[in-house]
Each structure stands twice: as C-alpha cells, then as structure tokens.
Amino acid sequence: YHALPCGLGSRDTLRLEKGYCLYGNDLSDETSPIEAGLSWIVKTKVKSNFVAKDIFVHQKESGVERKLMGFKLDSRRVPRNGYKIFNETGDQEIGFVTSGTQSPCLNIPIGMGYLQIDHAQAGNKIQIQMGKKNHPAEVTVLPFV
C-alpha cells in the first residue's frame, strides 16, 4: 500500500477538514451533541430515560442558543482553541474557536467554533481575535472537504 507513518497533527488536520469533532476541544461536558450538530446520535424518542434526556428533548424542540460551525480565514494565521470570535464589525463577541489548522487541501486556515445561533449561518462574515488583532473569516458549513 506504500503507506507512510504520520502523527497526531496529520490526524487532527484530516478530522478537521472532514468536520469531525474532537472530545476536549469541540465537545465536552459543557456542550451538547445538539449544539455540535450531532442530533442524529441522540435518540430522544426512546421510552427509557438517560442522563440529560430532558435537556436534549428541549433543545431539539426549542432550538439551541449556539451552534458549532466551520469558518475559513482570509489571513494566513491559524486559529487556536479558545480564541474569541466577533461579529463582522468586531464590536460584539459572538463565540469562541474550538479547533483550527492550516488546510493542505484548501491551502487556507480553517477552524470550528461555537457561534451564537443568530450568527451561525454559512456566508456570514466574522472576525477571529488572534493576539491584539482581529482577522476576517467567513462562516461555512461542515465538512470543509
């Protein structure tokens, strides 16, 4: 097969380009599968009860306040976990980055993060705060490739 060894960085880039979540970054005990776009794995119409079932039923029926979305950057800087996300004008914090990398397939920096639901539409312009400067980005649907 001529396979070559690769490390965790390669795996992380591949999963991010595919839009797959990484527990500890994109998923945690502070987020729900519904917010992460994984509602298909939460079966709320079963008769048995399970931890957080009531919360998931409510989120499926009423919607969520934030949503995990992808974004593509217009700069060469790579977004990192915890960076703040602002609206297009940069005057309102609307979310945070969970994962980011340089995409070898797209040849641009990409990332995922949680956005307030009213800003979580593909095509929306946002800004990612990196250091003292904000960098323009565009919200996109997942997967990237």
Residue locations for each model-derived region?
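Conserved, structured C-terminal
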Residues: 1-145
